[in-house]
Amino acid sequence: MRSKWIRLWATGMMWMGAMLPAAVTSAATLDCLIEPFRIVNVASPLDGVLERVDVERGDLVKQGQVLALVEGSVQRAALEIAEARAQLETAVESGQVRLDYAIRKVASNEKLLEEHGISEREVDDSRAQRDLSRIALVEAQDNKRLAVLDVQRAAAELEVRTIRSPINGVVMERILSPMEQTKQTPIVKLAQLDPLRVEVFAPIALLGKVSVGMAAEVVPEVPVGGVPTARVTVVDRVVDAASGTFGVRLELPNPGYRLPAGLKCKVRF
């Protein structure tokens, strides 16, 4: 009887031991670091002199917001000229008037030819003039379309000199100032703070127990009210042999930028 109870106790302990890794996993608390989701060095695609820079360190920016302008007085003048040309209607209007007149003249001459009032050659001349007027009108219409395209080209050349923010975020650093050359140098450095990125180095004991999509609580070193929840987005498939750890990345929503980047934290899976 006693041996039977011993066997039952041993079986129970083995069962509890088998369940231990899951309990350890669910209670795992690890050090982590909260970082910007991304850092972007914003530069100009062309060399030139900065005309103005509209942001300073700490400014909040929206995607598409103008950050700076590269000097573009020549391009602005070219755009104004192109717009003026595109608005001109005189060539098309005069071409239409000449064609209408040539058509009427052909009709009149053909009638006179039937009455033997003019020669065949005069009718041919009027027909040729009509055809030339039609070609001239088509050319004027083509030039009008080209003028519109020239406006688009000039506007695109000017837009290239307008440096816009590629993200919603905050200005970490203003690197260049007005009148400085943009040659291969970032103008401003931006950080995207919503969402944030949480970096963790987990021990190999958790390998296979942390997976993409898993939720985790993040406790920053500075209280922010409540415990935000992040989700695992990356689990490294290569282990660092020297430290016996592997990298885990989580994505932490940060509406209103209530959490600053750069904080140390604890993460609980």
Where in this protein do the model-derived segments appear?
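Edge-of-domain interaction segments
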Residues: L206, E221, V239-A241, G247, ...
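N-terminal beta-strand block that forms a small beta-sandwich/beta-barrel module immediately after a flexible targeting
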Residues: G17-V49, T229-V234, F246, A261, ...
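Amphipathic alpha-helical coiled-coil/rod segments that serve as protein-protein coupling scaffolds
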Residues: K62-I167, I175
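Short beta-strand-turn/beta-hairpin segments enriched in glycine/proline and small hydrophobics
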Residues: A28-P45, L149-S165, V188-Q192, T233-V239
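Low-complexity, intrinsically disordered
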Residues: M214-T229, Y257
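Short, compositionally biased
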Residues: V74-T90, A202-L207, R231-V239
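Bacterial N-terminal signal peptides that target proteins for export
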Residues: R2-M16
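Surface-exposed patches in structured soluble domains
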Residues: L33, E51-D54, L60-V66, E157, ...
